[in-house]
């Protein structure tokens, strides 16, 4: 049974909406849709008043004006990589151990009015402008690696310029705004355009090697795993993410996908083929969470594959952090609840049951209220789609967990996918 949200939840957004200058029709729709959603998530995660005002003003000033046309049908005008229905924004809720306040983030692909044209064939201009504008306001942002990886992966000589007359089917860059309690952190994702001669992995690896990174040991471990290990060869890298901080402090996250879905495979990737040997206890916990989140029988053998799903984003997803501060990559796996759970409520209750059993369930009802706010009315226990992934990283004997949430702006025009 969901607890009812406080009547005061939207007071911050209502105050801002009352006094901020009016927006044009499309921008007004985005503001009146995203604003209450973000405000609800921040309120449920116990962000203080000033943090909520700042997050909403950032949204109003720098994000909403570049969101593009409002949804008018099930067909998105820009095929954003962000979500399965091409909604250009995805929220995340990071669970903090010890019942501490969760952290809220959203990743967003801004939409250029020139997207698909010769001037901006890969819809890159607004994200680049967002980064530059935020850097003027937040002096701690460091653009050293942003400039480097933009040049290497999207700049002159990259496939995005050599094929600039061709319309892209997907995204090449987007940003994430991490609203940590007390400050804002920014991350940028690069998705190289693959060609017959240059895979995404080839481009990402070369860009990291050319970055001046003082320690490539973690990268070399990933390269060896991908090329020489049976399970590693089942992975296809497709994206790189960096933090906008000084390079020595930044993460370097290489994202990879596989159509393999057994927990045995997931365990092998998490340990990098046995390279990491200190994860037995956390992997045991991960196995328990995997079964709960996906509604599997507790006795399901780790060799069993999940049911086959024919979709571009089906399968398992991972990221490898090859930052210079690490000699062995940190690995994160993404439980694909969007495609394999029974419904959103089942997946959420599986996650919450795990958290409560391990003493981390203090924000369970807050999370459920957030889901209820995002889900189409009456659909939380009828379909999947709001929760896309549960991200899992092994930290000592415990797990670090993050839920990813899709507001489904375009799916709202479709018949729900009932399970």
UniProtKB/Swiss-Prot annotation:
InterPro entries: Aro_prenylTrfase, Aro_prenylTrfase_DMATS, DMATS-type_fun. It comes from Gibberella fujikuroi (strain CBS 195.34 / IMI 58289 / NRRL A-6831) (Bakanae and foot rot disease fungus). Dimethylallyl diphosphate binds at residues 105, 187, 189, 251, 253, 255, 332, 334. L-tyrosine binds at residues 81, 257, 389. The gene is DMATS1. It catalyses: L-tyrosine + dimethylallyl diphosphate = 4-O-dimethylallyl-L-tyrosine + diphosphate. This is Dimethylallyltryptophan synthase 1. Disruption phenotype: Impairs the production of r-N-DMAT and ac-r-N-DMAT. Keywords: Transferase. Dimethylallyltryptophan synthase; part of the DMATS1 gene cluster that mediates the biosynthesis of a reversely N-prenylated monomeric L-tryptophan (r-N-DMAT). DMATS1 catalyzes the reverse N-prenylation of L-Trp with DMAPP to yield N-dimethylallyl-L-tryptophan. DMATS1 exhibits unusually broad substrate specificity and can utilize geranyl diphosphate (GPP) or L-Tyr as an alternative prenyl donor or acceptor, respectively. Is able to catalyze both forward and reverse prenylation, i.e., at C1 or C3 of DMAPP; and it can catalyze C-N and C-O bond-forming reactions. Its EC number is 2.5.1.-, 2.5.1.122.
